[in-house]
Amino acid sequence: MTLLEFFRSILRRLGMIIFPSAFKTMSVSVKSSSAEVTVVETTGSLHTLESLKDEVMRLFRSPCTLRRMLSMSSALRIQYKAKLQESEACMLPSYCHALPNGRETGTYISLDVGGSTLRIALVELHGRESQNPMVIKHIASSKIDEHTRRLPGTEFFDWMAGKITDMLDQTKEAWPPQTTLPLGLAWSFPIEQTSHRGGKVQGMGKGFACAETTLGMDLGELIEAACARRNLNVRVDAIVNDSSATLLSQAYLDPATSMALILGTGTNAAAYLPTGCMSRSKFGARDQSWFDKADRVITNTEVSMFGKSILTETRWDELLNRQHQRPDFQPLEYMTTGRYLGELLRLIIIEAVETGELFGGVMPELLREGYSLDTEVMAKLEMDTTKTMQQSIAMIKKAFGLKKAPSLKEVKFLRTATESISYRASAYMAVAVHGLWALQKDTDINPTTPNGTPKTSIACNGSVILKYPGFKDRCEGFIRQMTDTASSPAGTFTAEKIVLEPTNEAAVFGAAVAVALADAP
């Protein structure tokens, strides 16, 4: 601590003793479009560490009552319905209008292209009743490094074709000579889909240069052409995004599956909805023959974009939003996902440091930059339930670059803040899921549940929902509370059970299932 920082800390403490009324927190109520009033706390004040801890708990946990969650779910359902009619950014129907019946079989190539990794797998589907319904016979993973991201135009697809060649060289026994190889693609970037097997390339972001000269070109044709240049007879039969792939992979195993949730660094959800509940303009220039077959369609909800003026915010949420490059763009994502949970804790730490009681009033050097606090730190804090918290003390000292170990009081403050942030995140995600489930019931998707089953299965994937301590169980518990109550917006469907089902290798299996559906008569 510098001499100046020391004197500032002393002055803060004196001010809190001499003029305590000047340091009281003020609260201002603002209107919300939901039935509840959103309370946004504002402060020009300094707290003790203990009073700030109590305030953090209150602000993050108070919206998580059953009554308020049901109110937010109802408001979200109204927002979902509106976007089914008008938005070009969310509630986007795919070309996949059928769910698997579990009898699809075959051998397929699955290609999973993400922001940092390319995975290629040889997948066998044996049928739902088989002992091993879905099997990965071979899988290869390649890092997409900075050099690869910068490959221009078709060179990136040539690189992909090279990796496909390498994998096929190791699995020649699976394919008779001269066979056309069916490929399913899980594509984690924007695409304007034009058919089940094709779509126009959009800007990819994340440092990828290939889209600059292939913008608007057909993605399936680009991959097939790159493979042809290597004398590979590959046919792209299906293109799906991550949420659709997750839904398909679980639906192959469980006929009660009609939704999927991705919750990791970001979030998204897919829902199986009636085509009739959407504006015809949503479907673009599709042939009437498609509509003749498509009573329902897997819909990319882009659920991260919902929740503005519905989900109750704290002053730290408002600060994060104001400082974001795209304020208000993804309200739900900013309050629930791996990228932002750590940043919310960092913003609370900044305020706690200002009390002079956290880290001696000095902001840790490693936390001065935005988004420098990894959500993994929060997960480790929540896992430490010991009285002395020695592991957490050592972990925080290292993670924050502190010169001396934090006190037990400081680490308990951090754990309380962490638990409050993740508690609300699981509640808000439950609210979003419950709203989508109620939307399915409203649109007559399955009033008696699929195939007469007594539950709705929601396929889940992503590091937060699957790996963050207690997150999935809490989220499922909140959903159960909302569906069990007689005041549920879904009304007559309150007896139904909603289960969050973890998925394994969802992108790889989902892409293969999508190909099998494309092959179906």
Predicted regions and their residues:
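Short glycine-aspartate micro-motif
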Residues: Y108-D112, P182-G184, V240, S258-I262, ...
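Short loop/turn segments at strand-loop or loop-helix junctions that form parts
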Residues: G114, I139-I144, L185-P190
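Conserved beta-strand elements of beta-rich interaction domains across eukaryotes
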Residues: G115-S116, L125-G127, S188-E192, S244-A245, ...
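Glycine-rich phosphate-binding loop of actin/hexokinase-like ATP-binding domains
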Residues: E129-I136, K206-G216, L247-R346, I350, ...
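Glycine-rich phosphate-binding loop and adjoining helix at the ATP-binding site
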Residues: S141-A161, I191-A251, A256-M259, T275-G307, ...
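A general secondary-structure junction signal
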Residues: L185-F189, N241-S243, N504
